């Protein structure tokens, strides 16, 4: 049996990407942003097609993502932040709530959201992960934006066929 397959597409040319970056644990978050933006550029996303918004901390990320999603100006969104257990007594709350909120935005608005909010035990773990996780977020955003477009086109073909049948 032969099956259809979609090949991952990492061509960022023409894609609009919105990034929400937390400022809490700023050195780590800046490292995430730098590597993410560098990778977006490498994938063909231009600077004029990227909007970076900063918020106080991880719990504020979902609201900013929601506002960007509501604008309908972006093909994908990226969440950047760092929740470090030693930095806050309510680590689990911040980690769980920010993660759930970030996921909900993607599902509620039908827009890909790459979640690069690090949750680590200490600063050393966060620093060790920030560069690769920032790059990963860029790749996820571009790949999923292209996948979303391809999957939407599948649905669009059926609608056109239905309209043609109704006219006949």
Curated annotation (Swiss-Prot):
The record lists the catalysed reaction(s) as: (2S)-2-hydroxy-3-oxobutyl phosphate + 5-amino-6-(D-ribitylamino)uracil = 6,7-dimethyl-8-(1-D-ribityl)lumazine + phosphate + 2 H2O + H(+)
Q: Which GO terms describe its biological process?
A: riboflavin biosynthetic process
Its Gene Ontology molecular function terms? Answer: 6,7-dimethyl-8-ribityllumazine synthase activity
The family database entries (CDD domains) matched by this protein are listed as:
Lumazine_synthase-I (cd09209)
Give the record's keywords alphabetically.
Riboflavin biosynthesis, Transferase
Where does this protein hold 5-amino-6-(D-ribitylamino)uracil?
Answer: 24, 58-60, 82-84, 115
Q: Which domain of life is it from?
A: Bacteria
CC terms in the record's Gene Ontology section = cytosol; riboflavin synthase complex
EC class name: transferase
Which E.C. number(s) belong to this protein? 2.5.1.78
Metabolic or biological pathway: Cofactor biosynthesis; riboflavin biosynthesis; riboflavin from 2-hydroxy-3-oxobutyl phosphate and 5-amino-6-(D-ribitylamino)uracil: step 1/2
- List residues binding (2S)-2-hydroxy-3-oxobutyl phosphate: 87-88, 129
What positions constitute the catalytic site? 90
What the record says about family reads: Belongs to the DMRL synthase family.
Query: Any idea what job this protein has?
Result: Catalyzes the formation of 6,7-dimethyl-8-ribityllumazine by condensation of 5-amino-6-(D-ribitylamino)uracil with 3,4-dihydroxy-2-butanone 4-phosphate. This is the penultimate step in the biosynthesis of riboflavin.
Name of the protein this chain belongs to: 6,7-dimethyl-8-ribityllumazine synthase
